Amino acid sequence: MAKEKFERTKPHANIGTIGHVDHGKTTLTAAITMVLAEASGGTAKGYDEIDSAPEEKARGITISTAHVEYETANRHYAHVDCPGHADYVKNMITGAAQMDGAILVVNAADGPMPQTREHILLARQVGVPALVVFLNKVDQVDDEELLELVEMEVRELLSSYEFPGDDLPIVAGSALAAVEGRDDHIGKDKILELMAAVDEYIPTPERPIDQPFLMPIEDVFSISGRGTVVTGRIERGVVKVGEEIEIVGVRDTTKTTCTGVEMFRKLLDQGQAGDNVGVLLRGVDREGVERGQVLAKPGSITPHHKFVAEAYILTKEEGGRHTPFFTNYRPQFYFRTTDVTGVVTLNEGTEMVMPGDNIEMNVELIVPIAMEEKLRFAIREGGRTVGAGVVSKIIE
């Protein structure tokens, strides 16, 4: 059977459900697909279909994630839901499932729980731009005042992690009622209200092609009579022949001009996000550029060597370390296309890090790398992945 063509008529956004175990993330995911399938077409997915998430590998780490898609009148969504807490941690840190926004699910009867807090912190650290809250299982709360208290508590918690707790939308309902097709006033109607809030409140992401040009350099060739060609996959933006570009990272930043772009041995006027290309650089010799640097629009990205990161350290079972590590740990940090050695400093009060932990840590690299917040990396020892991280704050 021929694959259905993906009709890109509506803006697209990636979202996910986050929150404490058993607060109803997967039931809500099922409810959204069912209600929207009826409202605007698409395929309804049952709880069991979503819950038996397949495993995937991202940056050498195995993660179970369920992907569903659905659409509202205004947008098309790709939605991720993870079965276990560890999968969320890994997913958010590796960026395996990029989230433009998330729905935080809180059981109205319990209020915020430890993982609620942890997922909000992770969302803050990895740069999820916007959250919308669904207070679930409202049929288990008899007292209207109790609901208001839980809502206040959730808003305060969000504010304490620098989300706009007072302003972000909170919808209260029952995902199970929606799945079972009963009590529309707390079921289906609330799911539609939630998705209207998501449509309005979660910003449409800027498409990669509209962002400033960036291409990680994978390889460097010298072509006699023509000069130096660097190859790689354009991560974002567009590069046109004749444009000035910068080579950033590892060494001092230099400027050059793109004198040619080729793909599959054909010459192009420009390369754009997603293309695997060779870029011909004017006046740069073979030794003047290396793997690990990036080509970028001038002024759009700068090299840094000190940063704060949120990291997940693999367990022994996942192929990670068997022993803890301490301050002054010196692994390799794999950014985009290359390994760079760095020194880890742990926060005060953190004596050591055990396999399976997720932590905040300070890193100082031996050479600077083109860096910005939200940049993902792998932590490696001798070529084997022992962790994953994301830059949460640049120091210098």
Curated annotation (Swiss-Prot):
EC number: 3.6.5.3
Region (G2), start-end ranges: 60-64
Region (G5): 174-176
Domain of life: Bacteria
One Pfam match: GTP_EFTU
One GO cellular component term: cytosol
Catalyzed reaction equations: GTP + H2O = GDP + phosphate + H(+)
CDD domains: EF_Tu (cd01884), EFTU_II (cd03697), EFTU_III (cd03707)
UniProt keyword terms in alphabetical order: Cytoplasm, Elongation factor, GTP-binding, Hydrolase, Magnesium, Metal-binding, Nucleotide-binding, Protein biosynthesis
Domain tr-type G residue range list: 10-206
GO molecular function annotations of the record: GTP binding; GTPase activity; guanosine tetraphosphate binding; translation elongation factor activity
InterPro entries to which the protein is assigned, alphabetical: EF-Tu_GTP-bd (IPR041709), EF-Tu_GTPase (IPR050055), EFTu-like_2 (IPR004161), EFTU_2 (IPR033720), G_TR_CS (IPR031157), P-loop_NTPase (IPR027417), Small_GTP-bd (IPR005225), T_Tr_GTP-bd_dom (IPR000795)
Annotated stretches, region: G4: 136-139
SUPFAM superfamilies in alphabetical order: EF-Tu/eEF-1alpha/eIF2-gamma C-terminal domain, P-loop containing nucleoside triphosphate hydrolases, Translation proteins
Region (G1): 19-26
PANTHER family: ELONGATION FACTOR TU, MITOCHONDRIAL (PTHR43721:SF22), ELONGATION FACTOR TU-RELATED (PTHR43721)
Subunit structure: Monomer.
Biological role stated in the UniProt entry: GTP hydrolase that promotes the GTP-dependent binding of aminoacyl-tRNA to the A-site of ribosomes during protein biosynthesis.
Name used for this protein in its record: Elongation factor Tu
Organism: Maricaulis maris (strain MCS10)
Gene name as annotated: tuf1
